[in-house]
Design a protein with these regions (language model features):
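Ferredoxin-type iron-sulfur electron-transfer modules and their immediate structural context
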Residues: 1-151
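Generic beta-strand/beta-sheet core signal
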Residues: 53, 155, 178-180
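Residue-level detector of alpha-helix initiation sites
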Residues: 92, 158-159, 183
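Fold-independent oxyanion-binding glycine-rich loops
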Residues: 114, 125, 157, 180-181
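N-terminal glycine-rich dinucleotide-binding loop that anchors FAD/FMN and/or NAD(P) in oxidoreductases
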Residues: 120, 191-203
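N-terminal Rossmann-like FAD-binding beta1-loop-alpha1 element of flavoenzymes
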Residues: 151-176
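Gly/Ser/Thr-rich beta-alpha loop segments that engage phosphate groups in nucleotides
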Residues: 160-163, 187-188, 193
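Glycine-rich FAD pyrophosphate-binding loop
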Residues: 173-189
Length: 203
């Protein structure tokens, strides 16, 4: 488990730190995501910078109203699987949003620390949560879902269609997804380049 610093003023002692970019000579040889992944201690240190605001502007600014301070606290404590569970309660594709969502204009832009201390690296921590949880074998718990026997057709296997399918499955409904392309993902697969979003994330 990552060690959590006991200093409640860590946002002063530890500045905002984004993941490092891969070396240029390495980026020239491959067409994959350009940022190195966060290490456990890095993610814990950055998550612990969160002030846990009583009225979290980051959460309000988020289009899906993610429980951002809550899962940042879990990451700071090293509880990655619980953070993944919480993250998936409000977001069907957090592993994608952590990579492509414009956090600088949304959650991070609204962070209380943004003026003066540098916003918490919310997007990078969100990416760390899902990548680490999946690597640990975590999958959403569907054991309590009761099948309804109903089926719903969804036209389009892009992010909206996939998100809709996820919500239906959690409600016990079987989604039947139709798309003109042979692969799922829509814009995620055919529009966003791999240096921003590797296609393996969707598999």
């Amino acid at each position: 488990m990552a060690e959590r610093l006991s200093n409640d003023f860590q946002f002063i002692d530890v500045g905002r730190k984004d993941p490092k970019k891969k070396l240029l000579r390495q980026r020239k040889k491959e067409f994959v995501e350009i940022y190195e992944p966060f290490k456990p201690q890095q993610s814990a240190d950055q998550a612990h910078r969160c002030l846990g605001c009583g009225n979290p502007y980051c959460e309000w600014k988020c289009p899906v109203h993610n429980f951002i301070p809550n899962w940042l606290k879990l990451v700071a404590e090293g509880n990655i699987l619980q953070a993944a569970e919480l993250s998936h309660q409000t977001n069907t594709l957090p592993e994608v949003c952590g990579r492509v969502c414009p956090q600088d204009r949304l959650c991070e832009g609204a962070c209380t620390l943004n003026d003066g201390f540098g916003a918490v690296t919310i997007g990078s921590v969100e990416k760390y949560i899902t990548d680490t949880a999946f690597a640990m074998g975590w999958r959403p718990d569907m054991s309590k879902v009761k099948p309804t026997g109903k089926r719903v057709a969804i036209i389009g296997a892009g992010p909206a269609g996939l998100g809709c399918a996820d919500v239906l499955v959690r409600g016990g409904v079987t989604p039947v997804v139709f798309d003109k392309n042979p692969e799922i993902g829509g814009l995620l697969t055919f529009g966003i380049p791999e240096f921003k979003l590797e296609k393996s994330v969707l598999s």
